[in-house]
């Protein structure tokens, strides 16, 4: 089974920049997307259905913000939207699809780079996410976590390495 994760930074823009052609070339069984930045009624279903993919989207309440998706060639047995924590679920950050005893997650972690408040939100999120995954693994041990973790441990992890030590978390 081939699984790919991809932060598209806007799904509609990614489609116009060649995502469907790339998808044909790579041919994953499952594609986990982050930062879809669209509402369900904006999803270009015909593009992906023509390639044999079913889509499961979880959008943020705020339009044009965040959002995750799982595109799959095989219909999942179950899809879980969110972690059951309203503050996070309102931002469309977590979706899980179960295929038999295998679970695949697409997650978009908060970045925390826009200021102290969002950095604090991110730190609480990371703690809650860890607790959630620990509990989930008790019933779904075959768990694949895909996503954008918004963690820049090394210069290679950021698009502009000069920014690595200017955002809140690396400075602390």
Task: Give each language-model segment a name.
Residues 2-12, 22, 26, 40-56:
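Internal alpha/beta domain cores that form substrate/cofactor-binding pockets in large enzymes
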